[in-house]
Structure formats: structure tokens, C-alpha cells
Amino acid sequence: YKRTSNPMMNRPVVKAELVEWMRSSQTQITGELAEVLKFAKENNIPVIPHETVIYFQMLLSLLQPKRILEIGTAIGFSALIMAQEVPNAEIVTIDRNPEMIELAKKNLGKYDHRNQIILKEGDAADILKELSGSFDVIFMDSAKSKYIEFLPIALDLLSENGVILMDDIFQGGEILTPIMEIKRNQRALERGLRKLFDEVLDNPKYLTSILPLGDGLLMIKKA
């Protein structure tokens, strides 16, 4: 699974000792989802880190969303975390990686006890256009260069008071590095993220917040 790993996962922007304290001091994942997490760690599959899990649990508890959209299922860990926190919510999750889809189907089949989660297979750009209704929470954890492309469709799908969450936006701090100093194969990703920041961070159409959780979490809400 090495090709699925995020090289920025182990480059915390926040002081490493503080990250470790946050991850070890807050309530740990137990039971069935601990098995999913264990598999991810043993196989170097990127899933949301523990400090982000805790934040999601708090946020979802407060928002009580009826419908959640996730772009980037991976092995289904984050979708299962969300399902556990809001047992009455419908969760639609999208992925196109056959290897991840196979693992996600296995995990959802075992642990999605209330059949809350709908897995859609294929390119998110196509599937997003086919979705109907609105979503109260939209979580993007997929190709970072595509976030800016997905944003207009996500905004159309977002409920009036809904929130969009975009993961891994710090890229280990490389967002501060001049483009030409970044490895060539990472430049498209960085350009996509910078276009996103130019669009949303100082735009009166949006309320935004950047949280230093994991490799950076961007929150967007319609103003």
C-alpha cells in the first residue's frame, strides 16, 4: 500500500512532542474501529490522525448532520468514525482506487451495522455531478490538487448552514515554499492548493478557518 501513503504524514507542522501528547492524552479508539486503525498503521495506509478524529467527534456531535459527503474513502475509517458519532446520518463516500475500494467494502460490510454508508465507486468529478439533495458536512480527503475543482460543486451541494472540511492542506509546510523549489511532481498539487487559498481565505463569500490538526484542516462555510 506504499503508493497510497502521504509523504507529509510524518512531517508535523506543530511541534512533534505536542502532536504526540495530543494523540496519546485524548480518548483512544477502541473496539471494532481500533482494528481498522491497526490495519491502516501496519500497512502504512493514510487515515485521519487521532487529533482530527477527536475534533470530528466534537464537531459532529454539535452539528448533528443529517447527510454527510466524503470524497476519498480510503479503507473506510473516517466514514465509520462519522457513522459512529451520528448514528442517524446518511453518509455518501466516494473513491476510485480499486485497492482501497476492496478494503473499504470489507470494512463497511463488517462494521457499518446500521447501513448508513453508501460507497460510490468512480471519479469524484463525475459522481459529484450526479448527486442530488444537500449535505450538511462535506469532507474532502482526496487529491489535493482537485480541491479547487471540487469546490464549486461542493458549494452547490452544501446545505444552508453546512460546512466543508478539506484535509492535508499544509503539506508538511510546503505551502510556504516557492513553487520552483518544490519537486516537479508535487507542483500541480501545490498550485491547486494555492489557487484554493486565493479563492477562499480572504473572500467575503466565505467564512473560513484553518486548524493545525494533522497536516492541516481547512473549514469553509458560506457567509
Language model features with spans:
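A short alpha-helical cap/connector motif
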Residues: Y1-F139, K144-L165, I169-A223
